[in-house]
């Protein structure tokens, strides 16, 4: 049969897990206390078989408000938030292999792309999709979700 494990993390603390020692067929749910306190209906990330799936991230400041300054500022803050989350999980931007960028206006694509490239090694750019859609959280101009390899 399957050797599976489900664990829940709040901050850095394991809340629930079973005795499985295999990383295959496992799901790890990762949330910060801030995410829980704000009542968001999703995990910040899940880890499945060594792959990190980050939920869509927008350019929020630590207090939860959206940064001012347009698409460039939002792109920088969004990617800074992604970088910080990966670092808390023991990873880095070099571990990202796929990004999906959702823009409220596709005309912002060139400026978003200029800022986006600053966060990655030019020799290791992740695969990427980008599209326009309306109704991003908090009226954001950009939302990015990523997949990364968990190295530890």
What does each model-identified segment do?
Residues 97-99:
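Surface-exposed aromatic
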Residues 2-80, 84-89, 94, 103-152:
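N-terminal presequence-like segments and the immediate start of the first folded domain
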